Amino acid sequence: MDSRLLVVLIPVLAAASWAVYNIGRVALQQFRKMTS
């Protein structure tokens, strides 16, 4: 594994996982509002 590839991949993966986490959290709140 090339270290330069990791330097590029780590921030991209961090940003992607952060986006998925935020979207999932908001979606869950909306879902709870609809069901309650």
From Swiss-Prot:
It is a single-pass membrane protein. Residues 1-4 are lumenal. PSII is composed of 1 copy each of membrane proteins PsbA, PsbB, PsbC, PsbD, PsbE, PsbF, PsbH, PsbI, PsbJ, PsbK, PsbL, PsbM, PsbT, PsbX, PsbY, PsbZ, Psb30/Ycf12, at least 3 peripheral proteins of the oxygen-evolving complex and a large number of cofactors. It forms dimeric complexes. GO terms for cellular component: chloroplast thylakoid membrane; photosystem II. Loosely associated component of the core of photosystem II (PSII), it is not always seen in crystals. PSII is a light-driven water plastoquinone oxidoreductase, using light energy to abstract electrons from H(2)O, generating a proton gradient subsequently used for ATP formation. It comes from Pyropia yezoensis. It holds the Pfam family PsbY. Keywords: Chloroplast, Membrane, Photosynthesis, Photosystem II, Plastid, Thylakoid, Transmembrane, Transmembrane helix. Belongs to the PsbY family. This is Photosystem II reaction center protein Y. GO terms for molecular function: manganese ion binding. Its main location: plastid. It is found in: Plastid, Chloroplast thylakoid membrane. The chain crosses the membrane at residues 5-23.
